[in-house]
């Protein structure tokens, strides 16, 4: 849900993800199809983290994955102040809810993004939020949000394997010619 907008917008999309393994899986999958993605987390050596920061500052990344704890560090926010952030994607957004089983205080601190980066779009995603949790997510993280709620049964989803050539062009053509009215 956030990868397509990230690729269509100039700058780097910052993806807030709660788990290192999830970040690694996402970045590996994106690298495999030619998307420039990286993560900053405690699994990196200082040299690896420095290389990712250099890639970020030079504009070579499309997506950067970070945990909420790292994102809320003043050094990380200062780093992001120096780049063109295209959007913030808050994955597993149900973690913002004090009522949820996965509550993490730093998710609640992401409210800062609204005031520090008011011009940067935000998207919050979760598959496990009841109505009360969704209201809390919108109240803390988003402004005038549109909510999309669907069941797990998705008959509109199907798989097709396509050789990769120019990923951005293929993606734009797919949207333009196969989903222009969606």
Predicted regions and their residues:
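Conserved strand-helix element at the start of the C-terminal RecA-like helicase core
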Residues: 13-23, 178-182
């Amino acid at each position: 849900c956030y990868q397509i907008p990230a690729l269509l917008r100039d700058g780097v999309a910052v993806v807030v993800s709660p788990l290192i393994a999830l970040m690694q899986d996402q970045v590996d999958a994106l690298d495999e199809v030619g998307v420039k993605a990286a993560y900053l987390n405690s699994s990196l050596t200082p040299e690896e983290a420095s290389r990712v920061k250099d890639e970020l500052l030079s504009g070579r990344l499309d997506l950067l994955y970070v945990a909420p704890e790292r994102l809320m560090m003043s050094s990380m926010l200062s780093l992001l102040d120096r780049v063109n952030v295209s959007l913030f994607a808050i994955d597993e957004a149900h973690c913002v809810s004090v009522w949820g089983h996965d509550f993490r205080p730093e998710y609640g601190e992401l409210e800062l993004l609204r005031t520090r980066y008011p011009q940067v779009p935000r998207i919050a995603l979760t598959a496990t939020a009841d109505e009360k949790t969704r209201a809390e997510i919108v109240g803390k993280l988003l402004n005038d949000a549109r909510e999309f709620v669907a069941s797990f049964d998705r008959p509109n989803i199907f798989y097709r394997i396509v050789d990769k050539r120019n990923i951005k062009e293929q993606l734009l053509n797919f949207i333009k010619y196969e989903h222009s009215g969606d």
